A protein has these predicted regions:
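Acidic helix/loop or adjacent segment enriched in Glu/Asp that either coordinates divalent metal
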Residues: 79-114
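Short helix-terminating capping/connector loops at secondary-structure junctions
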Residues: 32-34, 110-117
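Acidic, metal-ligating active-site segments
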Residues: 40-41, 47-74
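Short glycine-rich or small-residue beta-strand-to-loop segments that form or flank ligand, phosphate
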Residues: 39-41, 120-126
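Basic, amphipathic N-terminal segments that precede the first structured/catalytic domain
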Residues: 1-46
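Conserved active-site and cofactor/substrate-binding residues in soluble primary-metabolism enzymes
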Residues: 15, 19, 56, 91-94
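Short secondary-structure capping micro-motifs at structural edges
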Residues: 46-51, 81-85
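Short acidic, S/G/P-rich loop/turn micro-motifs used as interaction or catalytic elements
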Residues: 45-48, 94, 126
């Protein structure tokens, strides 16, 4: 299964990456004086199918208005055979970095430096 091209929002349902960026921008505009953390991370769940160990990957994008809640979006990633813990951690990291490299420049451009936020790539090691 290829990495999904859309995200899921618990409140808005299926969203394109462009819609996620627009929603993040709108959320930050609601309280421009607040401080925000944009956290992008991936995780996986292993299972065995016919004796073959496989992992299903999920990537989340979280916008945390520090002290006041937040929003999140997620998407299913790839399924692949897992040979080692190292390989699984590398894949999780790769998915997070790919998501950040596609979304963050667009978010920065759409905000035009108008908001106080920081980026965090969450890597779950182990």
């Amino acid at each position: 299964m290829a990495n999904s091209s859309y995200f899921i929002s618990p409140t808005k349902g299926q969203m394109s990456p462009a819609a996620v960026v627009a929603d993040i921008k709108d959320y930050l505009h609601q309280d421009p004086q607040a401080f925000y953390r944009l956290v992008i991370g991936s995780d996986s769940q292993e299972r065995r199918i016919d004796g073959v160990k496989e992992a299903n990957y999920v990537t989340a994008v979280v916008v945390h208005r520090v002290g006041h809640g937040g929003r999140y979006y997620w998407r299913n990633g790839t399924r692949q055979v897992v040979h080692s813990l190292r390989e699984k951690i590398y894949k999780e990291t790769q998915l997070s970095l790919e998501t950040a490299s596609s979304l963050v420049p667009v978010i920065r451009k759409s905000l035009n430096g108008s908001h106080n936020w920081e980026l965090e790539i969450h890597i779950d090691v182990g």
